[in-house]
């Protein structure tokens, strides 16, 4: 892993079963002298590609972090598969594959995980079984059934699987309903209780960010999850003025970047909280990173179509 241009991520390909692959982007610390103890893995939410988190990667790398992003299998983005075949278990497999790749192929054992929205539910599922340094979630789903009901305006999980419409629109994409719902029931992804059971023995430092105007994730359910964790290394913070869409405007987006970075720096130093100061990337640097990533994505997509 070597970088010659810190404004362009390094593109990696992890081969998985049946000639499929997971695409990974790696961003190095801007100043090697100030690099942190942990590598950060960012798990994007549903219908979000890794390039949607260019700004967060820029904030974290400006503040000394080595950052890894990836696109899940059967999802939007550059990895194999189509989003109408996505399931929570496929998302789990993708995240575990990336973490194992870091550890086995590159000897990186100190890993902090940042997961948003639907990917947070996946993070909650693996956190007790994977050797992480810390976990940060943002608008993290804890009650998948309730979130789906809020997003889809109806509780489709009460229906027989054969009766569920196959072309449900979830956040602008066609959710392969039968694949997704079957996996939810077979692998216990759907309830708040299932999430609590997965996290009650969590023993790594954990900070959860909720949004005070989030109709998809209920703050009291996140608080219930936290209260059932047998650890004193947890905290919850509110992103004031935000809905579930953390990119709805520049003020909300900047607050999200700042808050996550403050939490990551604190947790990297074994403190459960937020540091008071961070280095703010220049607007020009954020713009350059975004443009370069868009070009890289287009280049990769063009090659795959050739």
Curated annotation (Swiss-Prot):
The keyword DNA-binding does not apply. It holds the Pfam family Acyl_transf_2. InterPro entries: AB_hydrolase_fold, LuxD. Pathway: Lipid metabolism; fatty acid reduction for biolumincescence. The active site is at 117 (charge relay system), 214 (charge relay system), 244 (charge relay system). Keywords: Acyltransferase, Luminescence, Transferase. GO terms for biological process: bioluminescence; fatty acid metabolic process. The keyword Transferase applies. It is an enzyme of class 2 (transferase). Gene3D superfamilies: alpha/beta hydrolase. GO terms for molecular function: acyltransferase activity; acyltransferase activity, transferring groups other than amino-acyl groups. Its EC number is 2.3.1.-. Acyl transferase is part of the fatty acid reductase system required for aldehyde biosynthesis; it produces fatty acids for the luminescent reaction. Belongs to the LuxD family. This is Acyl transferase. It comes from Photobacterium phosphoreum. The lineage of its organism: Bacteria, Pseudomonadati, Pseudomonadota, Gammaproteobacteria, Vibrionales. The gene is luxD.
